[in-house]
Amino acid sequence: MVRAVAVLRGDSKVSGVVTFEQVDQNSQVSVIVDLVGNDANAKRGFHIHQFGDNTNGCTSAGPHFNPEGKTHGDRTAAVRHVGDLGNLESDAQGNIKTTFSDSVISLFGANSIIGRTIVIHAGEDDLGKGTSEESLKTGNAGARNACGVIGIAV
């Protein structure tokens, strides 16, 4: 079992922890999300970005992690960036506590997310279904509310 964790912070009031667990390189990754400070009852884009660099805040994390050069899509789409994790939805208090599994990201090999940055955005991800060219790159999810580098955990 490999376990990785990211502590998210940013210029907004959003903060929290995202944990990733994978039994072996052939299994799905469990993603455990615990975030606070979001707007109430809101959907927010959730992506893994290319770089583990937060020296200039979340901006220096670069674009979505996309080693296969695909267009943007939903977490469940056949065509998507490796880093596309769709939307998270907050409750009436602005908290997000959820767990899901993903078979595209990995804690092993070429699609490893270790050392990259996880970002929660200020807006809802249109999942690549918008009318602008930006939709196919970012999902028009807006500013980067909070982020954290994904590191190996015990």
From Swiss-Prot:
One of its GO terms (molecular function) is superoxide dismutase activity. The keyword Cell cycle does not apply. Zn(2+) binds at H64, H72, H81, D84. Its cofactor is Cu cation; Zn(2+). Disulfide bonds join C58-C147. The keyword Translocase does not apply. It catalyses: 2 superoxide + 2 H(+) = H2O2 + O2. GO terms for biological process: cell redox homeostasis; intracellular copper ion homeostasis; intracellular zinc ion homeostasis; removal of superoxide radicals. GO terms for cellular component: cytosol; mitochondrial intermembrane space. Pfam families: Sod_Cu. Keywords: Antioxidant, Copper, Cytoplasm, Disulfide bond, Metal-binding, Oxidoreductase, Zinc. It comes from the Eukaryota. Cu cation binds at H47, H49, H64, H121. Belongs to the Cu-Zn superoxide dismutase family. PANTHER family: SUPEROXIDE DISMUTASE CU-ZN -RELATED. This is Superoxide dismutase [Cu-Zn]. It comes from Schizosaccharomyces pombe (strain 972 / ATCC 24843) (Fission yeast).
